[in-house]
Amino acid sequence: YSSAASDVYKRQVSEHTMCVEKDENKMAFLIREHILALLGDHMVSIEEALLESFYILLELYKNQPITPELVEEYFSPETLLQLRTAITQAKSTISSLETWEECNELLQDLAVNYRKEGLYEKFLTPVITQAEYYSQIFGRQGIHVGEDMDATKGENEAGQLWDRWRQFRNAFASYELLLRNFLRNEVFSDLILPENFEMEPEEADNLEHMVLQMQWIAIAYAVIRQSLFLKWSLDADGIPAEEALDYETVREYMVVISRMTGYEDEDIRGYLENSFAELIWDWGYFALII
């Protein structure tokens, strides 16, 4: 990912004392508090809040041992402002349709076992059929969405998809408050190891758990957005884009995807290990799916 984003933290890390206060319990809750605050800040988009949170978690994970003072510095307004600028520049190099393409694959991968068992058919069958349709179109035409989109606007399936995706994102944005509340609930419920409430686990275990849970939350968010786009694309013909994405549909797909991603911690780790080249992603991949 962007070296500019990486440079933001060099000063903090170089000044970091090794006289670490061993209060991992306190720091886990402190980190969660800051991430909840980011997701609750309506001046920061949902995507920006997720990207910033994951970047900081990665930095904390890489620079153990950490102190509460270092955590506070990472989440300070000055540092966040610098990070936001760097992330905006880095994110601008990723095509939104590359994001679409990757999320289309994530949705299909996540749904495989549920479809085999005949679960959630009412919700999954239409959107997975649509997802597979797009995958076949791009494969048959040799179109890679991210690379070829600009050259094909309005001229073929890929160009039509680009137009639809932009329309959908406008409709999707009207449910920002609902999505923020969902993500804040996921962070509050899942970001901290249950052991924190009974004992103090090792700092490394805490931070790794936080990173993995943030990856899992990102998958859930990306798959909710993708499934809603595919459902919307089936329903939007002949009616205004906003009307085709109603509250009940959004809520229903959020509930279904939440159930589909409601894994135990060990199962989440297993899924990530089996589905990705590295257990812990680099920031660039997180940015790709967000």
For each of these PLM feature ranges, what is it?
Residues Y1-A5, Y9-Q12:
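Single conserved hydrophobic/aromatic residue that forms the stacking wall/gate
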Residues K10-D41, E52-E59:
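Intrinsically disordered, low-complexity regulatory regions of eukaryotic transcription factors
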Residues H42-I290:
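Hydrophobic, aromatic-lined core segments that form the binding pocket/scaffold
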